[in-house]
C-alpha cells in the first residue's frame, strides 16, 4: 500500500513514479562501495552494521539531517555518520528507496502534504492491521495519521509471536 501511495505522489517528495526499491543486498553493496570510496577500514565499517543503523534511524523517523543534528547521535562515532548520509544521498540520486524508505517517505509525504493525507484518510476509512505486534514506530505513525478522521482501526496481534520481544 505504501509503495502505491508513494508512486502516486512521488514528485511531491522529489522522486519519480518509477523509483526502484532496493533489495537488502543492493543496500549492502552500495554501503560497501561507499566505505571503499571513503577509504574507511572494512573491519570497523561493516555493511551489516551500517545498514542496521540506517534502518533503525528510518524506522524511528529520523532523517539523515536530523540524525547528524542530534546531540546524542553526535556523541557517537561521527565518522560512521558519513557513510550513512552518503548512502541516503546516493539512493535519492539513483531514484531508489530501500524498504525502510517506504515507511519514512510515506510519513514525510503524509506529514508535509495535507491534501494527500486528506485523500487517503477518505480512501481508507477502515483500517485493519494484522500482525500488529510486529509494527514499528514508523508504521504506527502512518496508521495513526491515516485513521485520524474516522478512527476506525482494528489491530490483530499475538504477543507470543512478536519478533520484537527481545527489545
Which residue stretches match the model-derived regions?
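Conserved helicase motor core of SF1/SF2 NTP-dependent helicases
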Residues: 129, 133-167
Amino acid at each position: 500500500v505504501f509503495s502505491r501511495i508513494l508512486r502516486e505522489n512521488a514528485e511531491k517528495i522529489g522522486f519519480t513514479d518509477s523509483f526502484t526499491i532496493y533489495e537488502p543486498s543492493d543496500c549492502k553493496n552500495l554501503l560497501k562501495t561507499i566505505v571503499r570510496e571513503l577509504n574507511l577500514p572494512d573491519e570497523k565499517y561493516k555493511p551489516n552494521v551500517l545498514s542496521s543503523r540506517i534502518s533503525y534511524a528510518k524506522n524511528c523517523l529520523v532523517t539523515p539531517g536530523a540524525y547528524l543534528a542530534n546531540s546524542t547521535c553526535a556523541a557517537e562515532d561521527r565518522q560512521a555518520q558519513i557513510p550513512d548520509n552518503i548512502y541516503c544521498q546516493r539512493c535519492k540520486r539513483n531514484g531508489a528507496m530501500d524498504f525502510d524508505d517506504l515507511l519514512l517517505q510515506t510519513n514525510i509525504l503524509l506529514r508535509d502534504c495535507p491534501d494527500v493525507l486528506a485523500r487517503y484518510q477518505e480512501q481508507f476509512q477502515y483500517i485493519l492491521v494484522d500482525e500488529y505486534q510486529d509494527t514499528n514506530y514508523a508504521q504506527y505513525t502512518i496508521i495513526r495519521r491515516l485513521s485520524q478522521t474516522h478512527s476506525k482501526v482494528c489491530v490483530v496481534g499475538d504477543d507470543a509471536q512478536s519478533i520484537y520481544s527481545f527489545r
